[in-house]
Amino acid sequence: FVGFKAGVKDYKLTYYTPDYETKDTDILAAFRVTPQPGVPPEEAGAAVAAESSTGTWTTVWTDGLTSLDRYKGRCYGIEPVAGEENQFIAYVAYPLDLFEEGSVTNMFTSIVGNVFGFKALRALRLEDLRIPPAYSKTFQGPPHGIQVERDKLNKYGRPLLGCTIKPKLGLSAKNYGRAVYECLRGGLDFTKDDENVNSQPFMRWRDRFLFCAEAIYKSQAETGEIKGHYLNATAGTCEEMIKRAVFARELGVPIVMHDYLTGGFTANTSLAHYCRDNGLLLHIHRAMHAVIDRQKNHGMHFRVLAKALRMSGGDHIHAGTVVGKLEGEREITLGFVDLLRDDFIEKDRSRGIYFTQDWVSMPGVLPVASGGIHVWHMPALTEIFGDDSVLQFGGGTLGHPWGNAPGAVANRVALEACVQARNEGRDLAREGNEIIREAAKWSPELAAACEVWKEIKFEFEAMDTL
């Protein structure tokens, strides 16, 4: 007699516990499960809980050396998805001790690791995570957060304006710096390295950093406003990434940038710590997110990637536009925008928020709206995102018929007009076009922009619906 019963047994006997009362310290997950035909939902949900925590495909002798009751993940609820015949939401609770403190990497390796290749499931999607304060408190979080950023930049009561420098690849460092200068002097707060711009043969990073710093200081002197350019520190190794951040700090610029998904959470968290220690703001780009979050039935919803970024650390993150050329349905986008900015977010299924999330005192992240937006979108963007956001117009600045600086002027005038109209109590949703038209009478730059983009729309159904 060996002391345990060998063999394969149903996961649901151990891992499906509908009576379980979740603890305040548990990490809770909501999975959208599509079982293979013939697999009951309880078994599928239990399999997810097992394979993402303590379980394996057969009972093992070493199970007797630990306490499964203390360490196992539990599927504590299953509900069918309305309008889908073979999809279920499985709720799984994970004991806190399964995770290394302060490591988004470890959290994801467990929760969205091997289980996503599991044969008994046709597809699996992580819709939301509840991060308990007991776990979130082990993370530094954003280097500075919204309030500190406003204080550093001395900009209040309005969204911030940015612009990605295009053409994204092929400019020399000197011409790139020139484009940055024109945008900043025209009235933008920030310009941005495209996420593809790292250090390529046509423009090495050190040269770009130098010419961009020159553009920042020249435009600051001219306008009397604090300016920034997101210098992309993303690199092939962590050491090289930190070296770039160090050079940015030596130049005295206010902000650097990182591609957090392609760069990886470990690198991102290291950079976020460096940024707080050295007074740099950190702008986060989400290149690769659509690989993970675009399919409705498999992968991870962006709200999970957004929560993970707030823990790993970043002061800005791209979050869709609701109105431009990229994905995003309004209520769902606003749901994760609140998860990024607010301290306490109530469960609200209509906005895709499966759990109440309490961030306690972790700083917030500014959502960045970027992609296919222009002056006519300004009232809608001001209305949807409010003051705590960064609105980024790449083509919408550089595509201006008179050049970058007038393009920047047009955007700044449009923004100031919208903010003023809102503060006067006007309804931006209804009177938006009128507000822009009025402002254009006083600004030839804005009038020219209004002329160019009057008809542009990207009309497709959003895929990210509930």
Swiss-Prot record:
Q: Which residues form the active site?
A: K166, H285
Family the UniProt entry places it in: Belongs to the RuBisCO large chain family. Type I subfamily.
Residues the entry annotates as binding substrate? N114, T164, K168, R286, H318, S370
Identify the enzyme class.
Answer: lyase
Q: How does it assemble?
A: Heterohexadecamer of 8 large chains and 8 small chains; disulfide-linked. The disulfide link is formed within the large subunit homodimers.
Predominant place of localization:
plastid
Q: Which UniProt keywords apply?
A: Calvin cycle, Carbon dioxide fixation, Chloroplast, Disulfide bond, Lyase, Magnesium, Metal-binding, Methylation, Monooxygenase, Oxidoreductase, Photorespiration, Photosynthesis, Plastid
Q: Where in the cell is it found?
A: Plastid, Chloroplast
GO MF annotation terms: magnesium ion binding; monooxygenase activity; ribulose-bisphosphate carboxylase activity
Q: Which domain of life is it from?
A: Eukaryota
Q: What is this protein called?
A: Ribulose bisphosphate carboxylase large chain
| GO cellular component entries | chloroplast
Q: What does this protein do?
A: RuBisCO catalyzes two reactions: the carboxylation of D-ribulose 1,5-bisphosphate, the primary event in carbon dioxide fixation, as well as the oxidative fragmentation of the pentose substrate in the photorespiration process. Both reactions occur simultaneously and in competition at the same active site.
Residues modified as N6-carboxylysine are K192
* Site note Transition state stabilizer, residues: K325
Cite the EC number.
Answer: 4.1.1.39
**Entry note: cofactor:** Binds 1 Mg(2+) ion per subunit.
Q: How is it modified after translation?
A: The disulfide bond which can form in the large chain dimeric partners within the hexadecamer appears to be associated with oxidative stress and protein turnover.
